Amino acid sequence: MANEGDVYKCELCGQVVKVLEEGGGTLVCCGEDMVKQ
């Protein structure tokens, strides 16, 4: 579950995202789960 303010990074392409609104599920980029920083 992604919480507001969390930062996630894709280990394949390096894209970084910051969560603005809490929600369920997983963040995915390039077909892989993103890693919480």
Curated annotation (Swiss-Prot):
Cited Pfam families: Desulfoferrod_N
Highest taxon of source: Bacteria
Family note: To the N-terminal section of desulfoferrodoxin.
Binding-site positions, Fe cation: 10, 13, 29-30
InterPro entries xrefs: Desulfoferrodoxin_N, Desulfoferrodoxin_N_sf, Desulforedoxin
Cofactor: Fe cation
Annotated coiled-coil segments of the chain: none
Cofactor binding, note field: Binds 2 irons ions per subunit via 4 cysteine residues per iron.
Subunit and partners: Homodimer.
Entry keywords, A to Z: Electron transport, Iron, Metal-binding, Transport
GO molecular function terms listed in the Swiss-Prot or TrEMBL record: iron ion binding
Protein name: Desulforedoxin
NCBIfam families found in the cross-reference section: desulf_FeS4
Job description of the protein: Nonheme iron protein possibly involved in electron transport.
